[in-house]
Amino acid sequence: MNFYSINLVKAHLINYPCPLNINFLWNYGFLLGIIFFIQIITGVFLASRYTPDVSYAYYSIQHILRELWSGWCFRYMHATGASLVFLLTYLHILRGLNYSYMYLPLSWISGLILFMIFIVTAFVGYVLPWGQMSYWGATVITNLLSSIPVAVIWICGGYTVSDPTIKRFFVLHFILPFIGLCIVFIHIFFLHLHGSTNPLGYDTALKIPFYPNLLSLDVKGFNNVIILFLIQSLFGIIPLSHPDNAIVVNTYVTPSQIVPEWYFLPFYAMLKTVPSKPAGLVIVLLSLQLLFLLAEQRSLTTIIQFKMIFGARDYSVPIIWFMCAFYALLWIGCQLPQDIFILYGRLFIVLFFCSGLFVLVHYRRTHYDYSSQANI
């Protein structure tokens, strides 16, 4: 068993063959794994002092911040790590879109399942501080499920967000990261099963071992990210949390503007700009399903240079519009629900789906095998 474990580590962490021309865009997976591990460690320490009760949840957070030794550090590292996880996840997905990573369907789908686990974990975790924004944000999101029979009662443990809700959310927030950790190993298994991609997209026998060549590149990226992570955690350069969430819950007073965390803003913009609650929920689910459908494409060649020569515009232009629509929805999500922003939000929702569907529908023409024309 010991020899098997040693050989497994050597095969996947030391001698794993990687393309020679991998650049810094391939660091996001390694960085995500490190930050996700930090999230689990800090979360376990915070959970040991947290009280999942509506009468004590807010005050247990204040106890961690004000009375425990370095409790404030663990709390802000955990909050900053959540933002960093989603930032790296979005960059990882966009890199996959740009370099046609969806042509490895097992790796792509397992990564998207992990992304869904991140979304659910972050949402239930946002409710746990039991501040004004946490309570009213959970109320708004759970009310979207009111069109589904008994869904709100099953999730919240009642007709509204209350004490059973925070207990259930705490259990989910504690368990889901460990489920996500299992999905991480599955994702790595499928990645190593097919082999890593590279910026040019061609399969070559010229490969180098992961250690020490590419590990040094990952460590260099980790040094840059950990500096930003510590600066944000210790000094709070960018205000990531809403001030209303530092106020204890008052069920009779609604905040002037209910805004989720920044990484939920694109989905919140879809919910806010659509007048019908069921329709908004369906659009959010379809936006996630669109990413899964991209794995149904089959490319005869993924060589980026040949695509750029013979047919890249049909692929790169809708991908660029897809990214622009996502960033525009992120900005619209934090704006007031005025008519102009609602109009822009609907336009960018249409652009988001049209650009994604264009890639799906035209993949046969866009990714025609031009290898014979390139004499390879």
UniProtKB/Swiss-Prot annotation:
* One GO biological process term: mitochondrial electron transport, ubiquinol to cytochrome c
Disulphide bridges, residue numbers: none
User: Mind telling me which GO cellular component terms the entry cites?
Assistant: mitochondrial inner membrane
Keywords on this record? Electron transport, Heme, Iron, Membrane, Metal-binding, Mitochondrion, Mitochondrion inner membrane, Respiratory chain, Transmembrane, Transmembrane helix, Transport, Ubiquinone
| Positions with a binding annotation for heme b b566 | H92, H187
Miscellaneous comment as given in the Swiss-Prot or TrEMBL entry: Heme 1 (or BL or b562) is low-potential and absorbs at about 562 nm, and heme 2 (or BH or b566) is high-potential and absorbs at about 566 nm.
Report what the protein is called: Cytochrome b
- What is the organism field in this record? Plasmodium falciparum
Q: What gene makes this protein?
A: MT-CYB
